[in-house]
């Protein structure tokens, strides 16, 4: 596989700072298993995969910022009111 260059990525990102921030966020998503890669992994590190996705135009800031909405229990469902009123 050919190397990914900064110039390849800058075709899809405005500047180097945004590239670093985008690649960092995407690499973290890939490393923690939060998201599936959009390109073949090919035994690369998450950072390289993130840069390859950016260079291919498959990932941008909108894709990285999308969070999966998970239906969960209410925020204070496990909060025990009786235990707190006894403490007062």
UniProtKB/Swiss-Prot annotation:
It comes from the Bacteria. SMART domains: RNA_pol_Rpb6 (SM01409). InterPro entries: DNA-dir_RNA_pol_omega, Pol_omega/Rpo6/RPB6, RPB6/omega-like_sf. Keywords: DNA-directed RNA polymerase, Nucleotidyltransferase, Transcription, Transferase. It holds the Pfam family RNA_pol_Rpb6. GO terms for molecular function: bacterial-type RNA polymerase core enzyme binding; DNA binding; DNA-directed RNA polymerase activity. It catalyses: RNA(n) + a ribonucleoside 5'-triphosphate = RNA(n+1) + diphosphate. Its EC number is 2.7.7.6. The keyword Transit peptide does not apply. GO terms for biological process: DNA-templated transcription initiation. GO terms for cellular component: cytosolic DNA-directed RNA polymerase complex. PANTHER family: DNA-DIRECTED RNA POLYMERASE SUBUNIT OMEGA. Belongs to the RNA polymerase subunit omega family. Promotes RNA polymerase assembly. Latches the N- and C-terminal regions of the beta' subunit thereby facilitating its interaction with the beta and alpha subunits. This is DNA-directed RNA polymerase subunit omega. It comes from Pseudomonas aeruginosa (strain ATCC 15692 / DSM 22644 / CIP 104116 / JCM 14847 / LMG 12228 / 1C / PRS 101 / PAO1).
